[in-house]
Amino acid sequence: MQHVKELSAKLKEKKGFALKMLIGLDGFVDEIIHPVDKRQDYKTFTRIKTIGEFGERITKAAGLSTNIEMVTIQTKLGGNGPILSNALLEYGVKLTYVGALGTPDIHPVFHPMTEKAAAVYSLCNPGLTDAYEFEDGKLIMGKHSSLSSLTWEVCKKGMGGAEGIAKMVGECHLFGMENWTMLPHMSDIWQGIIDEVFPLLPATAEKPLAFFDLADPEKRTKEDIRRAMGLIGKFEQKFRTILGLNEKEVYEIAEVLGITISDSSTDKLKDTVVAVHKAMGIYCLMVHPVRTVCCAIGDEYFFTEGPYCAKPKLTTGAGDNLNAGFCLGLALNLDPLSAITLGACTSGYYVRNAKSPTFDQAIAFAEDWDAGKV
């Protein structure tokens, strides 16, 4: 693909960039878990490979009972905001993080991230996640009670009031507040920013970017989702607003917004993305199915195949890494097709190596992808 071939050259021209970003608000301690199928001895086991197999195991236990062993493969930082931030920091962004990293002390899993960050504001304790990994996807089991203490008043108190927040936001190229679904007061926080921070923001020749990721809104009511979409739209007053979704989410948002796309459409994904983007009135809607990435900006639609990995080392966080690459691309003023391609490279590297790439590693990955080596 020509745009993959061209990406590495475009990135080389951007080396040595200086970007500031402010990201929040969640934080999770993730345990990456493999459910056991058969155990050969106390060290060796075969895992349950697919979600379907796992579902069959559970279904067979109905009316009876069963015991499924879970093996923790890794304990790591989690949450959309921290994983997104970790990837951006690896790229060399000067980043401030605000969120649920632990109080009074930051949880040790976040220390590598916070040591690289320009500044950190930890406002409450993190949530906990059990991530059951399979070859065809993952099941995320979350414990979120600690996040209910993260309110607009707590944000203001921890960040120097509306004036302190405005100063931080006003100095950034990109501002992001992630994981609306799991933060029960996020809509109120957004409303507080609109009401109290927007009037304090300086006028700029070009509006900075604002990035939002809902994180699977299925469990929230349609009224909640509709309100959140309206608030995200209002950020367009001060920002070039980006909403990042996966394929499942974009169809859910379309339904909430009353958008119906016929199943007979020759490209249902494109038609849905374009319609949701237009309905929301925002700068950009980016959607990442498992094997592809696309976005709508202005009146244009952009699409790329991705470097699909059949047997990933790690999938939890793949979407956040894609978001990081895409956001970095737009912040570097890459064209939209190059930005989604950088997102695909970032995610592609991450699932193969279980870590985020550096800028040089992303360039090398793009070259390998173009050469058919990934």
Task: Explain the meaning of each model-derived region.
Residues 1-64, 71-80, 90-301, 353-374:
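Ribokinase/PfkB-type carbohydrate-kinase core domain
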Residues 74-87, 313-321:
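Glycine/serine-rich anion-binding loops at beta->alpha junctions
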Residues 79-82, 86, 248, 324, ...:
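A structural signal for well-ordered alpha-helical segments within the folded catalytic domains
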Residues 85-94, 328-333:
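Alpha-helix C-terminal capping segments
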Residues 284, 307-373:
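Conserved post-catalytic alpha-helical subdomain immediately downstream of the catalytic base
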